[in-house]
């Protein structure tokens, strides 16, 4: 016998969490007035008249810091469930998590030595 009934609450919340934003967008699209004009098409800069082009190209340094942040954020997502069930999993899973962290440390040291984390 499969224990799929345990997931009923999960599927219910998943369906509700998908339906609420869809319904909100549909209702706002139906009820909101549609007015197009030059003011709607201009870029907004905190109430100040826009000066120049609104599109800017960001420097690559911002993307490198964002990439490093995402890597360590994903590391946290993977390590949190392991830490919560550490006493049940045993030593072999501890060694696997240690190898995972060591690979990330080696990667961050490599990025640091290549100069990817320097601002200037």
From Swiss-Prot:
It comes from the Eukaryota. GO terms for cellular component: chloroplast thylakoid membrane; NADH dehydrogenase complex. It is an enzyme of class 7 (translocase). One of its GO terms (molecular function) is NADH dehydrogenase (ubiquinone) activity. The chain crosses the membrane at residues 14-34, 64-84, 88-108. It catalyses: a plastoquinone + NADH + (n+1) H(+)(in) = a plastoquinol + NAD(+) + n H(+)(out); a plastoquinone + NADPH + (n+1) H(+)(in) = a plastoquinol + NADP(+) + n H(+)(out). GO terms for biological process: photosynthesis, light reaction. It is found in: Plastid, Chloroplast thylakoid membrane. Its EC number is 7.1.1.-. Keywords: Chloroplast, Membrane, NAD, NADP, Plastid, Plastoquinone, Quinone, Thylakoid, Translocase, Transmembrane, Transmembrane helix, Transport. Pfam families: Oxidored_q4 (PF00507). It is a multi-pass membrane protein. NDH shuttles electrons from NAD(P)H:plastoquinone, via FMN and iron-sulfur (Fe-S) centers, to quinones in the photosynthetic chain and possibly in a chloroplast respiratory chain. The immediate electron acceptor for the enzyme in this species is believed to be plastoquinone. Couples the redox reaction to proton translocation, and thus conserves the redox energy in a proton gradient. Belongs to the complex I subunit 3 family. NDH is composed of at least 16 different subunits, 5 of which are encoded in the nucleus. This is NAD(P)H-quinone oxidoreductase subunit 3, chloroplastic. It comes from Cicer arietinum (Chickpea).
